[in-house]
């Protein structure tokens, strides 16, 4: 971008970009925009705030159909963002391909040490012509958290799934049954978040299921439908899904993220439990209006064991350091909201806020 525009045009574009309070409030981005020399890659990313031609010409998914050599994709579970792109890339490939989804970190060095023997077998087949049966193996392999089993199949997800809703209810409950009463009785939940420039505390709402009574397996992606009202033109909606054990220990299962101004859906691609957002423009929110926001729950594979609970947390920022984020590199989180925002989350008969998850179908025993 620095080469494509005059200094005067760059200055004008930077000033416009800094009108976004999220960008202006974050020191690293403010510095990059004002001193782009030697930070050209970051500068271009920050300046291209919505999807479009600049990203498409660099998008591996767009380029994937041109690849005609064998591809083996490996990704480990965690927050789910990179899993989603890896799976989409796998779908776009036309040649021989394999997808392995490994366990939750801590991971080994990359390439993953535990996969070395498999790599050697693939090299022997494709480079040396040794018929060792590697191509007879299933195309998709998924480590399922909780049960710690490996599930294989010909595609993603490797099992048939049924997307079923769990509804947000009063008293912070998640239930298969929707709330039967109106907002006059089921008053909304809510939270106020000050910018992280003035506080270190990230406000969090949570809802949880009753303890599971039998092993419950979920593999795939999902959706969260939130009926929300905010008092600003924009905010973030950040969900984190946890497997909580009877003793209180927790493991992150997956996440979902949506900037409120990017709430538009690609209606042609979106299906139940599988939403797509084009991210090609930002549409400010009308403060005080109740909107339905549909978040994409990133892919995961997990079995909730008897006695465990599914806990869903909602915030508009990611905690800079907690039991999970403390393990991540600096700035490995979404850009915090730079303005104070009050959020109301409606979950009543007229506003069925819910999370739609990929329950695997049980095959009847013969």
Question: What is the predicted role of each segment?
Answer:
Residues 92, 115-117, 127-366:
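Glycine/threonine-rich phosphate-binding loop and adjacent beta-strand/alpha-helix elements that clamp
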Residues 67, 73-75:
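Short beta-strand/loop motif that positions the catalytic acidic residue
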Residues 79-85:
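Conserved alpha/beta-hydrolase "acid-adjacent" motif
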Residues 85-88, 114, 118-122:
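Extracytoplasmic/secreted proteins, especially bacterial periplasmic and envelope-associated proteins
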Residues 77-79, 104-105, 317:
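Acidic beta-to-alpha connecting loop that harbors the catalytic carboxylate
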Residues 105-114:
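Catalytic histidine-centered segment of alpha/beta-hydrolase-like enzymes
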Residues 94-106:
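Catalytic histidine neighborhood in serine/cysteine hydrolases
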Residues 1-66:
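Accessory cap/linker subdomain of secreted extracellular hydrolases
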């Amino acid at each position: 971008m620095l080469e494509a525009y005059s200094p005067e045009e760059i200055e004008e574009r930077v000033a416009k970009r800094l009108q976004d309070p999220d960008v202006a409030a974050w020191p690293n981005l403010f510095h990059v925009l004002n001193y782009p020399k030697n930070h050209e890659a970051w500068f271009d990313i920050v300046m291209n705030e919505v999807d479009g031609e600049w990203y498409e010409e660099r998008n591996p998914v767009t380029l994937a159909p041109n690849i005609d050599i064998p591809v083996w994709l490996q990704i480990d579970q965690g927050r789910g963002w990179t899993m989603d792109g890896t799976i989409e890339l796998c779908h776009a490939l036309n040649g021989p391909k394999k997808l392995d989804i490994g366990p939750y970190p801590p991971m080994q060095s990359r390439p993953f040490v535990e996969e070395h023997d498999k790599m050697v077998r693939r090299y022997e087949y494709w480079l040396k012509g040794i018929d060792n049966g590697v191509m007879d193996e299933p195309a998709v392999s998924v480590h399922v958290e909780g049960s710690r089993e490996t599930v294989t199949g010909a595609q993603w997800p490797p099992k048939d799934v049924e997307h079923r809703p769990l509804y947000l209810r009063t008293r912070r409950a998640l239930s298969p049954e929707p709330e039967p009463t109106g907002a006059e009785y089921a008053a909304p939940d809510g939270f106020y978040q000050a910018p992280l420039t003035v506080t270190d505390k990230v406000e969090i709402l949570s809802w949880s299921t009753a303890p599971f009574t039998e092993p419950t397996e979920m593999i795939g992606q999902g959706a969260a439908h939130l009926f929300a009202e905010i008092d600003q033109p924009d905010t973030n909606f950040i969900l984190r899904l946890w497997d909580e054990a009877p003793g209180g220990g927790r493991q992150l299962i997956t996440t979902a993220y949506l900037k409120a101004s990017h709430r538009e859906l690609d209606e042609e691609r979106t299906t139940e439990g599988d939403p797509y957002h084009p991210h090609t423009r930002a549409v400010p929110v009308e403060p005080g209006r109740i909107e339905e926001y549909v978040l994409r729950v990133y892919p995961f594979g997990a079995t909730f064991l008897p006695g465990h609970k599914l806990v869903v947390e909602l915030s508009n920022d990611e905690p800079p350091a907690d039991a999970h984020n403390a393990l991540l590199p600096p700035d490995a989180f979404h850009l915090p909201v730079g303005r104070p925002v009050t959020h109301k989350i409606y979950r009543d008969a007229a506003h069925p806020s819910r999370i739609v998850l990929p329950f695997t179908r049980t095959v009847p025993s013969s």
